């Protein structure tokens, strides 16, 4: 079996400029994903998909390969990671580089480690699902969620659950925004991962942080330090 890791990292991040290579406790953010992929020992190649020369330069420095530059039409605010992965697989196939399994690993997942990737890969192989992705449990019952209308009035999505005990409600999970394993065939044929053909690798909440704002970035640093107390 040949395994490929694709790290999508476009250059046009808006809320955190240069997010993928911003300093994170002394190293570019993307370096953590590259090093975890390399140290996991499960990938034959770690390939960057980027439209940005500086990101490519940083990724090469930390051990990834960049055999192509991502097209600009796959690099705007509306471009999906799935489209970027499909594009990368197709380019590599045109170069006679064929892989059985492909992992999309986000550049913004510094809280992971090599063992998590290894365990997730093993579960993916055992489950024989089309995809396996990282997820985590919502910290509050989503059945009790509410929204505000245009007049700032409160409406519950479903009032019948208001008095239910938390332990009686079905647990809900969300995408951790970290990694997605899939067969090459599934990546090329499917445009939506979140279906019964997928399985999940559940991460504890202290290993999950969606880094979209500077506040998120600082919180991720705190989590990293807590998770690696002996190193600080």
From Swiss-Prot:
Name the reaction it catalyses: pseudaminate + CTP = CMP-pseudaminate + diphosphate
Pfam families for this protein:
CTP_transf_3
The GO terms describing molecular function are:
metal ion binding; N-acylneuraminate cytidylyltransferase activity
Keywords carried by this UniProt record: Magnesium, Metal-binding, Nucleotidyltransferase, Transferase
Recorded superkingdom: Bacteria
Q: Which Gene3D superfamilies match?
A: Spore Coat Polysaccharide Biosynthesis Protein SpsA, Chain A (3.90.550.10)
Q: Which CDD domains match?
A: CMP-NeuAc_Synthase
Which co-factors does it depend on? Answer: Mg(2+)
EC number annotated for this UniProt entry: 2.7.7.81
- Sum up the protein's function in the record's words: Catalyzes the final step in the biosynthesis of pseudaminic acid, a sialic-acid-like sugar that is used to modify flagellin. Mediates the activation of pseudaminic acid with CMP by forming CMP-pseudaminic acid.
Q: Which PANTHER family match?
A: HAD SUPERFAMILY MEMBERS CMAS AND KDSC, N-ACYLNEURAMINATE CYTIDYLYLTRANSFERASE-RELATED
Instruction: Write out the similarity annotation.
Output: Belongs to the CMP-NeuNAc synthase family.
What is the recorded name of this protein?
Pseudaminic acid cytidylyltransferase
From which organism does this entry originate? Campylobacter jejuni subsp. jejuni serotype O:23/36 (strain 81-176)
